Structures are given as C-alpha cells and as structure tokens.
C-alpha cells in the first residue's frame, strides 16, 4: 500500500505532540502492511464524510483517508474524535 498525505493532514500532523506523531506513524506503517488489521478498526464513514475511511491510531486519535486505487490511499485528516467530527 502506498500512502500520500494531503496538505491538511500535514498541517494537523505537525500540531500533534511527539507521542501522538509516533502513534500515527506506527498506525500508518501497519496500514501499509495490512490495511485490514483489526488493531486499526478501519471503517467507512457516512454522511458528510462519505467515501472516506477512518482508522484508529490509539486512544482518541483518528486518521481519515480515501482510497485512490486498490493499492494507494491519501491521508486527509488526523486528530481526536471531537476535532474531526465537529
């Protein structure tokens, strides 16, 4: 799996603490190896975020992404549940 990042993701990622950035990096590495790993709790989003998916990076930290193809995705957002859904 190839992962690209959207500029919004890059800005949000830069604002995370060092510990949170490490969790995101670990989750992205796992996602590249196995996008359907149970630990990621990957699921499709609905409504305003239809076409996007969410994975868990631990605790309340979430990553949003869209599939570009069967082997490529773009990370579009990262943050807590409240930051992403409000």
For each of these PLM feature ranges, what is it?
Residues 25-27, 43-45, 66, 70:
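General helical structural elements
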Residues 1-28:
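Arg/Lys-rich, positively charged N-terminal/basic patches that mediate binding to nucleic acids
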Residues 8, 50, 80:
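Residues that form or immediately flank small-molecule/cofactor binding pockets and catalytic motifs
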Residues 7, 44-46, 59:
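A general secondary-structure junction signal
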Residues 30-55:
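A short, surface-exposed loop/turn module that caps and links secondary-structure elements
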Residues 2, 11, 22, 56-62, ...:
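Enriched for short, Lys/Arg-rich terminal
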């Amino acid at each position: 799996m190839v992962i690209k990042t959207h500029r919004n993701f890059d800005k949000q990622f830069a604002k995370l603490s060092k510990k949170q950035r490490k969790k995101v990096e670990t989750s992205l590495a796992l996602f590249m190896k196995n996008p359907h790993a149970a630990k990621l709790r990957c699921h499709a989003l609905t409504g305003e975020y239809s076409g996007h998916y969410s994975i868990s990076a631990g605790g309340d930290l979430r990553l949003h992404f869209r599939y570009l193809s069967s082997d490529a995705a773009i990370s579009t957002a990262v943050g807590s549940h409240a930051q992403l859904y409000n």
